[in-house]
Amino acid sequence: MEWDTVIGLEVHAQLKTKSKLFSGASTAFGATPNSQTSFIDAGLPGVLPVLNEQAIIMAIQFGLAIHGTINDLSVFERKNYFYPDLPKGYQISQYQKPIVTNGYLNIQLGNNLEKTVHIARAHLEEDAGKSLHDAHTDYTGIDLNRAGTPLLEIVTTPCLYSAEEAINYLKTLHQLVRFLGICDGNMQEGSFRCDVNLSIKPKGSSVLGTRTELKNLNSFRFIEKAIAFEQARHQDILESGLSVIQETRLYNPDNNTTQAMRGKENENDYRYFPDPDLLPIHIDKEQIEEIKNNLPDLPEAISKELKNTPSLNDEDINFILSSPDTYQYYKKIKSLCSAADKTIINWLKGQYAAFLNEHTLTFETPPISAKTMAAFLSKIHEKKISSSIAKNIFSMLCAGEEDIDAIIEREGYQQQNDNSALEEIVEQIIKQYPEQVTEYKAGKEKLLAFFIGQAMKQTKGKANPEQINLLLKKHLG
């Protein structure tokens, strides 16, 4: 029997606010357990939450970026459940009146296909604390540093039908929240986590099957493997004549399986009701318009613009959009530099990227400023230095030097463009290698690169390769 897989995703994006959603405690990652916990985060009686306005602005930014509806009235509600790392006994979230509804995100699939993923809602809520099972041998510790950190929960409709679609959507969403500047996207630190709701149904059926929820996945690779395992598990159960249990499961990467965590709750089980300590949020059109006018450049629009640059291919564009810092670095260089787009991107994704990887650096803290890199690439474009000399200069720039003209002067790197001097060198090379000349004239044209190499060797890389190329062709006939 053939089956259709149906997937809906819930992503928790941790917002890049300096303080928590309802308290002034810091959201910095990695602090000593419980050192960033206020009375509000700890759920002590007699304290009242105060809403972080920056979180509202970030949620509106996201809503605008996904073409969603920003609701003029939004309400916080208490989501009631018991868990050791939830000291209040409830989580402040949004249910009936979220801040954003009815958005979408376009994703790219194979064979140049595009799919629109419908986003049902995006709402604000506070994160829970963290249970530390390995910190002690005979009991579990609770760290409330994370409790109260603002999350934007982004919920799709069940409109994804394969692991490929799910991963492409998640990568596109991950890219978007980073370019918006609302989430750092650090999956290892839990800043971007995903719950997968999955069911299968007979192929072509309009009736959805019983779903299971895979909780707190924080790796694209693990998400893909968890979906594949859960698809196969559902299929085995149904083809054995049994029924899938609606439950929450955890993925175990050590043995690539999922295991039951608890029965899956329905929304009614949480007994949502409006939080009496928080006023409804009223958002006016003027505020939305102001935020819209200050949105940064976003990946979809940038990609369309870059595709109009004939010299850039998809690989180049993907590299430029690999992070907001990479894009901003490229954009700054392009604004200051006379070099062609392809020259810029070849250097950035070639030698520069290799250096960054080798030294565990990123374009967030580049070893060469965009201004210096632009000046360097302009020298190459203007043929003031050869490509081989450029590699030497680049190494010096990576080591901390900044004055390119001083390097050229000190090292004697000025490009040799004297036509008569270069012509003498070409004539000497032709006399020096008569056998290769005969082979070249017999049709072995690849030997031209050999002759150019000899000329560059004699001039210690200072000759203009294009001039050498023309002179060789002239003398070799």
Swiss-Prot record:
Q: What is its EC number?
A: 6.3.5.-
**Enzyme class per UniProt:** ligase
Disulfides per UniProt = none
State whether keyword Ribonucleoprotein applies: no
Biological process (GO) annotations? glutaminyl-tRNAGln biosynthesis via transamidation; translation
Q: Which domain of life is it from?
A: Bacteria
Question: What reaction(s) does this enzyme catalyze?
Answer: L-glutamyl-tRNA(Gln) + L-glutamine + ATP + H2O = L-glutaminyl-tRNA(Gln) + L-glutamate + ADP + phosphate + H(+); L-aspartyl-tRNA(Asn) + L-glutamine + ATP + H2O = L-asparaginyl-tRNA(Asn) + L-glutamate + ADP + phosphate + 2 H(+)
What the protein does comes down to: Allows the formation of correctly charged Asn-tRNA(Asn) or Gln-tRNA(Gln) through the transamidation of misacylated Asp-tRNA(Asn) or Glu-tRNA(Gln) in organisms which lack either or both of asparaginyl-tRNA or glutaminyl-tRNA synthetases. The reaction takes place in the presence of glutamine and ATP through an activated phospho-Asp-tRNA(Asn) or phospho-Glu-tRNA(Gln).
For this chain, the family text in UniProt reads: Belongs to the GatB/GatE family. GatB subfamily.
Protein name, as recorded: Aspartyl/glutamyl-tRNA(Asn/Gln) amidotransferase subunit B
